[in-house]
Structures are given as C-alpha cells and as structure tokens.
Regions:
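N-terminal alpha/beta PP-like core and its mobile active-site loop of ThDP/TPP-dependent enzymes
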Residues: 1-110
Length: 110
C-alpha cells in the first residue's frame, strides 16, 4: 500500500470478514505509528492481525536516535500480545504464539 494506515485497516477488514489471521507491516518510527489506529480498531473488533514493524539495531535502543522508539510499549494497550525479536532463532516460537493468540481472541462479525 502507499500508506501504513491503509495496510492496517485492510488487514483488520480481512481478519474481521474471514476470521483468518492477516498481516500488515511497516518501517520503523513513523511507519509504526501510522499503523496504530488500524491496529486499535482490529483489537476492538477482535480481528486477528499480525503486525510487524521494523526497528533499529539493538545498540541504538533506549537512546536518542533517529526514528527509534519503544514500539512494543506503544502497541501494548491496543494489542493482545506484543514482543520484540532480537534473535532470529526465536521467530518460529513468536509466530506460533501469535497464531495461538489470534485463534483464542478472534470472532467473526459477518
């Protein structure tokens, strides 16, 4: 899409209409903040959405650095579960937990 907010709303709509896990992604910083409204809507509608955002290198976290922010903290109040992946070997486990959460909390509206 041309804008992350559109991606979040499209993922929310797909999840809401099908009950299947959908996904949206963004770059770090402003890209992640642009997802926030659509993700909050998905959470309120119990739509299963996996949200992936970029992040700067771990040595830049918790410092004043261009476009670095605490994305997990920002999304915590509008998601069922949030995590940060710092080691690629944990990706399968984290995706598995995401799928488990999506099945528990999803409900069809249409």
């Amino acid at each position: 899409t041309r804008h992350e907010q559109s991606a979040a709303f499209m993922a929310e709509s797909y999840g809401k209409l099908t009950g299947k896990l959908s996904c949206c992604l963004s770059t770090l910083g402003p890209g992640a903040t642009n997802l926030l409204t659509g993700v909050a809507d998905a959470n309120m509608d119990h739509s299963p959405v996996l949200v992936l955002t970029g992040q700067g290198s771990s040595n830049r976290l918790h410092k004043e650095s261009h476009q670095i922010m605490d994305v997990c903290n920002m999304f915590e109040s509008v998601t069922k579960w949030t995590t940060s992946i710092r080691n690629p070997s944990t990706i399968p486990e984290r995706i598995g937990k995401t799928r488990s959460c999506s099945h528990r909390f999803a409900r069809r509206h249409c």
